[in-house]
């Protein structure tokens, strides 16, 4: 693991390209959101925290989750939570708003959550797969 000497963030790759920006306030991301939006976020985070440590990065325009690499990001809206998971494979599902294949083991799956009920067993399994990507287990690390 490499730690940026300027901002203190950790990355799997030495000299990882990133923006050294101070992190924002997590609560500010939800200031204009309905309670159900925060409940969906908290339910998803609870699933991931049960898997192991995760760094929550409240950036200027999004909230990112990071272990060795970022594996999920969220943008709270007034009535829903937009986000994406990075998975090591393409998973067909009507629940995805879009899927972008960057490489064979780097596939972005965009979603929209409206409440805690959206964090069901299926979504929890996808969170676990994304967490493994964040740990780089899909690369044998």
Indicate residue ranges for each PLM-predicted region.
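Charge-dense, helix-prone N-terminal extensions
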Residues: 1-141
């Amino acid at each position: 693991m490499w730690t940026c000497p300027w901002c203190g963030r950790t990355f799997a790759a030495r000299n990882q390209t990133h923006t050294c920006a101070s992190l924002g306030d997590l609560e500010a991301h939800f200031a204009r959101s309905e309670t159900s939006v925060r409940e969906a976020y908290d339910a998803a985070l609870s699933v991931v925290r049960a898997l192991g440590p995760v760094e929550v990065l409240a950036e200027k325009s999004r909230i990112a989750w990071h272990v060795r690499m970022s594996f999920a990001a969220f943008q709270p809206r007034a009535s829903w939570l937009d986000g994406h998971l990075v998975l090591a494979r393409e998973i067909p599902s009507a629940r995805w708003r879009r899927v972008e294949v960057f490489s064979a083991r780097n596939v972005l799956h965009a979603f929209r959550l409206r409440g805690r009920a959206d964090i069901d067993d299926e979504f929890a399994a996808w969170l676990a797969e994304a967490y493994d990507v964040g740990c780089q287990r899909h690369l044998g690390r």
